[in-house]
Amino acid sequence: MISFSTCWNSGRHTAGEEMLREIKGEVGFGCVELGHGIRLSLMPGVQKMFDAGEITFSSLHNFCPLPVEVMQASPDVYQFSSAHERERERAVRQTLQTIDFAERLGAPFVILHCGEVRMNPITDELISLIKKGKLFAREYVRKKVKAVQKREASAPPYLARVKDSLKRIAEYASHKNVRLGIEGRRGYEEIPSERELPVLLDEINSPQLGYWHDFGHIQIKENLGFLDHEEWLRQIGQRAFGCHLQDCIWPAQDHQPPFSGSVELEKLVPLLPSNCLFVWEMSPRKTAEEIRRSVAQWQERFGA
């Protein structure tokens, strides 16, 4: 099944109906993921289109809609990993609200970011070094090793807070017929890492909770030398509910149309479940023509 994220166009619309009609008319998708840039003012039009049977929803990306005090896409504005109880509670409450909206719109999935370990944001530093031709130079390796040591030493309390929040959220989702996908993240600082995710899923042990693959994010991590994209999917792929489908131009330009970058979809897609949801998550800078062309290529290779 394929779907299309509103992250492509939510920022340029003030009416939910027009946002969804652009997706239907310009790129040809009748199934949509509501991204994390959906302002509350867009929701009446979204509900109207759904009630009229003009659109279906595959998924909502937390937080959806945005908290009223937040004016632009901010999926990490409140974090389950925070040391501050008030922030964690706000994150949980906003997530429960997203689950309620998903139930109302018949969307089976909600995609989650879980937070981060507070540390120097090493990912962007490493990308900057790569762009200077210093991949695996001494400076690069030194920074990377130091970051790994720091994260491994600091992560346990952050992970514990994330696990406590996810248990509550998964229990709530179980009564709403909504499943939760923990997104594979771009930043090494973010939670969970690929080492942590299988353990986290095992410990919570809920059928409501699974993995949400992001082809662009994980390709960036491969480009940085943190993992092997194919081997990671061989390990985790069958626990994926869905994925954000995008390509990545070396080293870290993601949210590109499939088949325009370095992601080897032909060998990676078969490692995901046959019922996996594939959501096009495109940069707003990509044209409708570029997207339509990628969809046609996808259908040639993988069918609808």
Stretches found by the model and what they are:
Residues M1-G25, L40, G45, D51-T56, ...:
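Histidine-acidic metal/acid-base catalytic patches
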Residues C7-G11, H61-V68, G115-V117:
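Short glycine-enriched loops at secondary-structure junctions
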Residues G30-R39:
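A short beta-strand-loop structural module common to alpha/beta enzyme folds
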Residues F50-S74:
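Short hydrophobic interaction/assembly module
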Residues L66-A73, M119-I122, A252:
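Short acidic/His/Gly/Ser-rich catalytic and metal-binding motifs that mark active-site loops
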Residues P75, Y140-K146, H244-I249:
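Short, basic/glycine-rich phosphate-binding loops at helix/coil junctions
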Residues F80-G210:
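Active-site acidic/histidine proton-transfer and metal-coordination neighborhood
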